[in-house]
């Protein structure tokens, strides 16, 4: 988070890092759908896992000079705002997701899958990414934001290994923010209509922030216009008005 060499001398006593690695991924239980006691037990065990990783870094991690351990590493309660220096709440890498009017699939955003789709359709499409000439993610006419990150999944509790492959700069479709069954709920983060695979690129914080902005604007627009979120997306006039509103506020909805 902080490289002290990029600041005025004395601004920071050292670098500050936020550790979110597979080594401290806790996969031994759920925080939801269980009793409060069980949930807290998993949180406590997850903290111990993080402390174990810190201890390994302090004592056994290989150093460039051939030695082991970085004993100067320490927790920062003053930065985290907690007594123990760990995070205030657990970071949930993959959330539960809604059953949405539209679900983003790997074939919409994965680079290799898009190449296969383009070959099947007999065209190469419009270029939006210079390093991948002629190839672009699926275009969504109801786009309410953009994002760009590779599809990156950590090992799972089911035994799956790393999944890490390229995606293309993509859009956030409004249909992925609309539940099929519930009409008065708008997801505002990584809980939109994606799959286990595509959540790997839509879960990133900048994308979540874009989703949150779109969700807030959608709620406000729906109230002001006395419309349901579904009616806004599924009526061309209302969708156009909503997209014009968010674009006026500086929201980018495509990569053109």
Per-region residue spans from a language model:
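Flavin (FAD/FMN)-binding glycine-rich loop and adjacent Rossmann-like elements that form
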Residues: 1-256
